[in-house]
Amino acid sequence: MEVPISGGGGGERFCHAAQVVGADGEMDGEAMARFAAGAGLLGRGLSYAVVSIVGPQGSGKSTLLNQLFGTSFTEMDALKGRSQTTKGIWIAKAVGIEPFTVVMDLEGTDGRERGEDDTAFEKQSALFALAVSDIVMINLWCHDIGREHAANRPLLKTIFEVLMRLFSPRKTTLLLVIRDKTKTPLEYLTQALKEDIQKIWNAVRKPEVYKEAALSEFFNVEVTALSSYEEKENLFKEQVGQLRQRFIHSIAPGGLAADRRGVIPASGFCLSALQIWKVIRENKDLNLPAHKIMVATVRCEEIADEKLRSFISDKGWLELETAANSGLVPGFGKKLNAILDFYLSEYDTEAMYFDEDVRTAKRQQLESEILKHTYDAFKKMLEHLHHVVLNKFKSDLEQSLRSGEGFAASARYCVQSSMAEFDAGLRDALVKHAEWDTTKVRSKLEQHIEAHATSVRGTKLAELKANYEKKLLDTLAGPVQSILETGEKDSWACIRRLYRHATESAILAFSASLSEFELDQTTIRKMVMELREHARSIVEEKAREEAGNVLMRMKERFSTVLSRDKDSMPRTWKGNEDIRAITREARLAALRLMSVMAAVRLDDKPDKIDRALTTALLDGGPLSQKRSIEFTSDPLASSTWEEVSEKNTLITPVQCKSIWRQFNAETEYAVAQAISMQEAHRRSNNWLPPAWTVLLLAILGYNEFIFLLRNPLYLLGLFVAFVVSYAAWLQYDITAYFRHGTLSGLLTITSGFLPTIMDIITAVINMSHNQKSSSHPPRHRPPLHPQSFRNQAQQQSQAQVQYQAPSSLSSSSSVGSNSDDES
């Protein structure tokens, strides 16, 4: 509570005074906290002192404190009788004294209110005063000095007894204040007091550890005297003023409270007082060093918790955390370090006076808790950094490859630059107080980069391989097909040369391209082998494709050889060709084609396929006589070829036999047609009557022949008719009409004779009309030459004959066919 006191000049000032321990012995922690906060004690650190006063009831303790420190403790009113005024323990702040001085007024001893036997509270309050105070003032009456049973002796005995329950590392100043001083010199009074105190110290039972200990090891004993306040008020106040000066700078070296060992920082004073009183009330020994550690522990924890809460709610940290969750934050570590250092420095400032070991331990815990709270944001930063660096690696690698750099060099450079960028970003994001393990994150990034590089390398190798495979396909497929279609004996020799040249060229270029990837030799050999096998598969696939069309190719080859001569000119069947020999030659060419396509011969191993096919299928061949010697049975009655592996077999012997049978069946018509055309040509060339017919005509027409010789005019007419007929013969190519037989030729000529006569008549009429018109010409025209008429008529006749020739030819052909059937 706050108690107003009167000050000089008639003004009124306030001093913070509070009852912290009631008459019932219970401490009011809230009152203690209110006092500390209101008086400004919490921020004083170690720069404060605690003064308490003990003494008999009614000895003027409260009056002395009020006069000495300007406090407002309740004083006894002498007019109302000598009764107890101070109950329990009161606390206040000294006014106008530096350092900050806490003043405690304790309940007087030897009071009638508690009774003669109730000394428990006296001992407890005395022990509390010794535990928390730097200076303990003992109020004594001057007339009691030297008496054996004076009131001060039980009090001193109580103080020395409770001292044994303390384990304090520092000395406490005992300031003996002699009240109502007489004329006896102070030196004699001091000597008498010290002798009495020494006797009391010697009489007190002490533990073995302190049995030989001197009083000076525990106390600094000081003695002062004051005149009577009631009789010599002015002198009393003057002496109090002099005593007050001794409390100014009391904690400085040489001051009243110079021993500062084990002092509790001001922020922990309330907690310390509460805990000390609790231990005292429980009648336990009070270990002040351990109590100091306890107070430091509790108080440092409170400070650390407060700073942690402040950090968690800090606006700068919240903004930084939000930014880190959404993306990469430049200077993340620097910004977080600044915030962290701020709160750690605040902790250091507030906890600097507590035990160093406790302070350091709690600081580490605070730092650990803050870092634990920030770790998620740091992880997010690493995730963003991982994502950014990985994407940049992908982009840089792709751009480098597009610029034409080799894969291995590009990947190596991009990996180095990306990891350097990651390390720089990691340093930028690290918190200097943290010892977070980032090796796993870095290793994970390296794995992802390596995986992407491996994927890109695989893709590029696949593209490179596909490119060379396509080149091999373009180089081999067409030429191999063309060579196989020729069906020559050296076809596979040509294919082998082509295959080796194309394969070696491709492998040479492919190996040079693979050097950019810096692959191991095992991988290179494997890929080269795969490319070589692909080239072989192209040839084999094309050979199998052509083998599937072997029957069609054989028929084409047969037709080509049969229908064209050695100069590749269309063959005309004039009647003198050897169709049997030509047919054999065509079948031999077709058989050779099937032999070429029967097996893959890339290994240049000899086989007997051609000989077996010729011997077994081509009857009458030059090797047929050796069949019984070389082949004891049918060589085609098998599913495999001799000296040819199954994988290289394209057409089995049984399949060859079946194909040949089908081939013969499908080519018989072409041979029969050739024979028919040859026979037709022969008949067309024999349009003149037979010789016996000519002889018969000569015998039977002898008289008519003699008649013509005797009449030259008839002979001349016959001659003219012959000339005209011959001219017409040549003009209209009458021979062509008789190629398909005499009857068909006559029918064709007869069908075209009437239109020709009509054309001639029309031409004559037109010429006559033109001559009449020319007798009255409007302008001169060139004369019509007779030859032009003939030319015009001839051209029209020829056009008419040519127009009618196809139908006539078809008619003659049909007639000739019918006549042949009838004959």
Swiss-Prot record:
Residues 710-712 are lumenal. Residues 45-260 form the GB1/RHD3-type G domain. Residues 226-246 form a coiled coil. Its EC number is 3.6.5.-. Probable GTP-binding protein that may be involved in cell development. Belongs to the TRAFAC class dynamin-like GTPase superfamily. GB1/RHD3 GTPase family. RHD3 subfamily. This is Protein ROOT HAIR DEFECTIVE 3 homolog 2.
